[in-house]
Amino acid sequence: MAEKYCRVTQMLGKQSISFANPVYIQGSASIVGKKEGEGPLGHHFDVVEEDDKFGQKTWEEAENVMQQKSAGMAVEKANLQMKDIRMIFAGDLLAQSTASSFGIGALGCPVYGLFGACSTMGESLALAAMAVAAGYGENVMAVTSSHFATAEKEFRFPLGYGNQRPLSASWTVTGSGACVVSAKVSRVKITGVTTGKIIDDGLKDSQNMGACMAPAACSTIVQNLKDFGRNPDDYDKIITGDLGYVGQQILLDLLEKEGYAAAKVHQDCGILIYDRETQDTHSGGSGCGCSAVVLASYIIPKIACGDWKRVLFVPTGALMSKVSFYEGNSVPGIAQAVVLENAEN
């Protein structure tokens, strides 16, 4: 009789995974543009480039270079070489993910291309953690990027048009962040993930993405708390990706209706990265690079030094395309959650 196959399940609740053995962030790095360097977190980033074209001829080529550089720095900080990376999970905002194709493609590593809009860093980090936890790779990378000029060209208006932006609009971050996830013990570990659902409340205003994404953020956060049997105060911080000032208040109101008070522990990468009073960024920052660079150069170091013991990282995405928008469709949202902890916790 064939021996019955047995496995230890790591599934938890309805949408979560609790890793039987934690995986670790071995190295992380970020590269940003001039505007991001002038913001409150400017001194945290690894590289601040004064030239938003990064020495290239086009904005798109600049974004390619950002991904290459952030990936290279993350590998170097992990004391590895690119040949040690088993696979890369990469994504961006451009059509057919060309920044990842041309940027990461030049590194010669196996790649999975992803699209989760501005939630892509959460998606890529969750998948990298699952791959390492399952034994599919010892060192796996998660990397994403965005660029203000490429996003404006792709989704909004030509830069020379000079359109008036509403106060609910966000500012796409020029930046790329990368993390090397490994089985080797380091100071920051990933202990679980919660996979988000697509939530569509029928909102159609692409200039108010925070409102479009807030219900998805609420859905994922609530499910994480239920699956892990936790309350918001069990996290030092619950940090969303790019809800901005508008989306943050909506999220907190929605969580209150679900019975969770999270105002004391909630932060948002889109709020942290810019000073809206002096930088004219309205609701805050957005883009795949927003949560990625804040994670790589601010959140992870805060956990590594012990300032924070446990953080719920929840990047958020507005799942629209220029075609769906022009056809009058709504803007669905999604949020992916990753539980980050100090290794001694």
Predicted regions and their residues:
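Acidic, glycine-rich active-site loops and adjacent beta-strand->loop/helix elements
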Residues: G91-Q96, C118-S119, T144-T150, G196-I198, ...
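Short active-site-adjacent structural elements
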Residues: K34, I199, G247-Q249, L319-S324
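Condensing-enzyme catalytic core mediating Claisen C-C bond formation in acyl metabolism
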Residues: E3-E60, P158-V222, D227-R230, A263-D280, ...
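Short, well-ordered amphipathic alpha-helical segments that serve as non-catalytic structural scaffolds
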Residues: E63-N79, L125-L127, C212-D227, V294-I299
